[in-house]
């Protein structure tokens, strides 16, 4: 059963009050960064500066894909340096490959499943040395992998799936979630939710099936509906999904009910050039998502590190209330 629920607007409280401790976990979601690199890298730099400055208040950073615009060595080197700064600040992070990060050569967006450039600059050999490393689907790349996080008294498992994950990748992810019933699960992926707050289902032109990715292997690629049906719906401990990719308004929110009755809170956030009202490649907007087991709330705020202000719209700052966190782990 899929349903869009009313989201209650929250006046923008200060992030400084969201220090992670006890029963509170604070994660930052970095939406598509691609157009910063070709238009205004200084705005992206402001995001990294802000993350480093607030490192003691952040449990992890999740980037939702399209790190680059053209999948070029220059862009990848820039992103590698940026995430090295985040890592050196002691902040756990994960990244996923978007359609602009995959392709036969720079500027060919997911025409084939070639992630060589991404994995050259974000190699598994480096990433698996991190204390929060979980595992990789193929044991060779960061195409599909998971990490483990401990925040306060909560254990988290974060699945990171590439643009248009294959059936094999979903089968692997299904097995990983299945053997960790004691952890709250978040999915971080690129293409999942549409801007009308519905799942990608093969009918919209942003769907992974509209690209060449996977065709050279004759393999199935999955959109949001496929990921939901084959993976997320099946597990009680899945609580949230973060994604990007889609333009128009660039935002969407959906709450779906899993097989075991658990609510899954799914959020699309994208501010890149091409999104309605976008300026400066995205104006440095990022999402601050706080899971508060004490108040039973998920608090979402959207903050511009460039403007040093929260987004003025209620569609970007809201709360999910009456979240029974304990129910996910029974």
Model regions and ranges:
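Conserved beta-sheet core of the metallophosphoesterase superfamily
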Residues: 211-212, 216-293
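Active-site-proximal segments of metal-dependent phosphoesterases and phosphodiesterases across multiple
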Residues: 22, 170, 180-238
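Active-site environment of divalent metal-dependent phosphoester hydrolases
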Residues: 36-38, 69-72, 97-106, 142-145, ...
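Active-site neighborhood of phospho(di)ester-bond hydrolases with catalytic His/Asp-centered motifs
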Residues: 29-31, 59-66, 92-99, 161, ...
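A short C-terminal boundary segment appended to hydrolase-like catalytic domains
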Residues: 279-330
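Loop/turn elements at helix/coil->beta-strand transitions in domains of secreted/extracellular proteins
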Residues: 23-26, 56-61, 88-94, 151-157, ...
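N-terminal active-site segment of His-dependent metallophosphoesterases
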Residues: 17-75, 205-208
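Extended active-site neighborhood of metal-dependent phosphoesterases/phosphodiesterases
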Residues: 73-172, 178-181, 210, 251-272, ...
């Amino acid at each position: 059963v899929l349903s869009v629920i009313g989201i209650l607007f929250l006046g923008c409280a200060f992030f400084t009050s969201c220090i992670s401790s006890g029963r509170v976990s604070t994660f930052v979601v970095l939406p598509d960064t691609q157009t910063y690199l070709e238009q205004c890298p200084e705005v992206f730099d402001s995001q990294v500066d802000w993350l480093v400055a607030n490192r003691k208040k952040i449990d992890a950073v999740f980037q939702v894909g399209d790190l680059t615009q053209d999948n070029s060595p220059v862009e990848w080197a820039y992103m590698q340096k940026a995430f090295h700064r985040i890592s050196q600040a002691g902040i756990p992070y994960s990244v996923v490959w978007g359609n602009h990060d995959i392709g036969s050569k720079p500027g060919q967006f997911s025409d084939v499943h070639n992630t060589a450039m991404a994995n050259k600059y974000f190699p598994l050999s480096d990433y698996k040395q991190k204390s929060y490393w979980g595992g990789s689907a193929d044991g060779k790349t960061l195409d599909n992998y998971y990490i483990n996080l401990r925040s306060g008294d909560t254990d988290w498992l974060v699945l990171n799936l590439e643009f248009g994950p294959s059936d094999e990748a979903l089968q692997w992810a299904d097995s990983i979630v299945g053997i960790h019933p004691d952890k709250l699960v978040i999915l971080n992926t690129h293409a999942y939710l549409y801007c009308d707050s519905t799942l990608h289902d093969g009918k919209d032109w942003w769907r992974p099936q509209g690209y060449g990715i996977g065709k050279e292997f004759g393999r199935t690629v999955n959109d949001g509906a496929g990921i939901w049906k084959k993976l997320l719906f099946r597990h009680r401990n899945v609580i949230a999904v973060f994604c990007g990719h889609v333009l128009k308004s660039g935002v969407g929110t959906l709450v779906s009910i899993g097989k075991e009755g658990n609510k899954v809170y799914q959020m699309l956030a994208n501010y890149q050039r091409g999104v309605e009202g976008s300026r400066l490649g995205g104006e440095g907007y990022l999402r601050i998502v706080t899971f508060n087991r004490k108040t039973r709330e998920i608090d979402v705020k959207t903050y511009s590190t460039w403007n040093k202000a929260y987004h003025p719209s209620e569609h970007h700052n809201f709360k999910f209330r009456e979240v029974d966190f304990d129910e996910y782990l029974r």
